Amino acid sequence: MPRARRKFYIHTFGCQMNQADSGIITALLEKEGYQQAASEEEAGIIMLNTCAVRENAVERISHYLQHVKGFKRKCPELIVGLTGCIPQYRREELFTVFPVIDFLAGPDTYRVLPALIAEAGDSRSARLEFNAFETYDGVRQARTQSLNAFVPIIRGCNNMCAFCVVPFTRGRERSHPFESVLDEVRALADDGCREITLLGQNVNSYHDPASGADFSRLLDAVSREAPETRIRFTTSHPKDMSHSLVETMALRPNICNHLHLPVQSGSTRMLARMNRGHDIEEYRNKIELLRKWIPGISLSTDLIAGFCGESEADHDQTLELMREVRFDSVFMFYYSVRQGTLAARTMPDDVPEEVKKQRLQEIIDLQNGISAELLGLAPGSVVEVLVESESRRSSDQLMGRTDGNRVVVFDRGIHQPGDLVRVMITGSTSATLFGQSAENLQ
């Protein structure tokens, strides 16, 4: 199949913000007359929208570029670009490491992508500057499916956590205008979107200078603007989680009873080394507040094993916190050095890799047991499930999520993606609930 010069294909790596950014890139290019290709094979432009948070993400992108290299060998005029965090993090050295690349674009420079693509036929080019005001206000994301949508509300991060590259790849915080967020939410709801997730590296830092609105006020307004749509948000920093936010979550019925609240470690000593800005008692107090106002709330978190200087006692405190809080799910990693971060500059990476892996495995084993126990309590209950798709196992089954973000699989019957269904839970694994349809709510 011949490659169409003005057709592009985006392969997205990493977080939900990157998925939203790929929608922004698509909208900007389509406005200039480019078309989205159905596959890599027919595209004249291939872009990798990249993530730099963890080393394995970099390795995955390196592997994928080897795959793209084969395409370019057969079609030398193919244009290959890297967008997102890795170009901002690794910069022009990427041209030397990966000769297949024609252009680089950082997260704040997507408006100039048409110009970069035009220049790519003659020379390599890069646009990697930060823009303290860029929020892509006025750009309506192109969407690949109609049921769920991501709406960025704040870009960048002012928290300088010792392990994290995000401030160096996405710059300082700047909030999307309050009315622009509401306009986008209203349009999505009018289009039939059933679930909207508000996005930011730290949504709790949201502040609109024009209106003075903070995140709790924005969240309340969003939930009222789309009262029939489920509202989620991520990610929250514990130190910035306010009492008013918890009240808003409790009082607005369409805000999902789920919160992702990364803690990273159960040790106050490690939290200080990580520059997290709070101690473990403050975290415990906020968990207590959440459960007081929102009984049954589903909680998830992030944990890092083997950060610089972590002792066995620190690790044991993390396990203790897990047993106490009983998170519904945990994103678990062992520490890898990210160049340029505070930890890389000032702290030795002194926990042996085999110890990191062992501690991570202990965290995984404990969480798998907790998750299985929590889901094991569900059989016999009736839950509301927003159907997302067919089950991977069978077209006769559907997969959806509760407002607590638990995955539920049940027999299809008369239901379709987008339906809100009451499901009687009949069984579970450590990650999935199984059930039978009770009734179609709407």
UniProtKB/Swiss-Prot annotation:
It catalyses: N(6)-dimethylallyladenosine(37) in tRNA + (sulfur carrier)-SH + AH2 + 2 S-adenosyl-L-methionine = 2-methylsulfanyl-N(6)-dimethylallyladenosine(37) in tRNA + (sulfur carrier)-H + 5'-deoxyadenosine + L-methionine + A + S-adenosyl-L-homocysteine + 2 H(+). Its EC number is 2.8.4.3. It is an enzyme of class 2 (transferase). InterPro entries: Elp3/MiaA/NifB-like_rSAM, Methylthiotransferase, Methylthiotransferase_CS, Methylthiotransferase_N, Methylthiotransferase_N_sf, MiaB_methiolase, rSAM, rSAM_horseshoe. Transmembrane segments: none annotated. GO terms for molecular function: 4 iron, 4 sulfur cluster binding; metal ion binding; N6-isopentenyladenosine methylthiotransferase activity. Disulfide bonds: none annotated. Catalyzes the methylthiolation of N6-(dimethylallyl)adenosine (i(6)A), leading to the formation of 2-methylthio-N6-(dimethylallyl)adenosine (ms(2)i(6)A) at position 37 in tRNAs that read codons beginning with uridine. This is tRNA-2-methylthio-N(6)-dimethylallyladenosine synthase.
